[in-house]
Each structure stands twice: as C-alpha cells, then as structure tokens.
Amino acid sequence: MENVPNVYFNPVFIEPTFKHSLLSVYKHRLIVLFEVFIVFILIYVFFRSELNMFFMPKRKIPDPIDRLRRANLACEDDKLMIYGLPWMTTQTSALSINSKPIVYKDCAKLLRSINGSQPVSLNDVLRR
C-alpha cells in the first residue's frame, strides 16, 4: 500500500467580533410601541361596549312602583277601592289577578289591621 498521509481535523473556534445589535432594546423601541398600539386597537375593537359601560355613568332606571306610592286604598261597602293613581282621576275598584273586583266581607277591618286609623297607601300593602 502506498503511504497515504493522515489528515487531522482540529476544531477551530472563531470568536465573533461583531456586536449583537439585533438584540438591543434601544433599537426596537418603535417596534414595541407599535405592538402596544396594535394591542390597544384590538382591545378597543373587541371590547368597545364593555369599555363604554365601564366608563359611562350608570343610567338610573325608574322604578315602576314609584308611580303608585301616592295611591291609597279605601273601602266602599265590601268593595276595595283605589284612588290617587296618576293616570286616573276618579276612584276605581281594585282588581285581583284575574281582573275581577276585590270584594271582602270585612274590608274596613282589614284596612285598619294594616295601618291602624291612618289611610292605607298602596305602598304599605306592597311592602308587606
């Protein structure tokens, strides 16, 4: 056999001499600001109504029973009557759930048991 020279490979390490400018924070401030701007735009687009509800004052919803607070109950014989409703000028019969007038044998005694000798307002009955 011929005499073949042996070749030996030695690892060579080259130390980088350039600086890693791509990893620098100072160079990419605008990119970070742009990303933050995009995030705020996306939050606004997808959560607009929630943000509006959070920052706007709550609307006060009127209580429908407030209109009935001035109404009073009275008895006419055994019939329960209601007067003082804002949309009615006369005394009308109080109606039950099935739209029939409420007739009770001892109507006056029932009203006295609720509020004594004071006039019985509809609010007194609704709070019980």
Swiss-Prot record:
Sorted alphabetically, the keyword list is: Disulfide bond, Fusion of virus membrane with host cell membrane, Fusion of virus membrane with host membrane, Late protein, Membrane, Signal-anchor, Transmembrane, Transmembrane helix, Viral envelope protein, Viral penetration into host cytoplasm, Virion, Virus entry into host cell
**Keyword S-adenosyl-L-methionine included in the entry's annotation:** no
TM ranges are: 31-51
UniProt topology in membrane? Single-pass type III membrane protein
Question: Which purpose does this protein serve, as stated in its record?
Answer: Component of the entry fusion complex (EFC), which consists of 11 proteins. During cell infection, this complex mediates entry of the virion core into the host cytoplasm by a two-step mechanism consisting of lipid mixing of the viral and cellular membranes and subsequent pore formation.
**Which family does the UniProt entry place this protein in?**
Belongs to the orthopoxvirus OPG099 family.
The name on file for this protein is: Entry-fusion complex protein OPG094
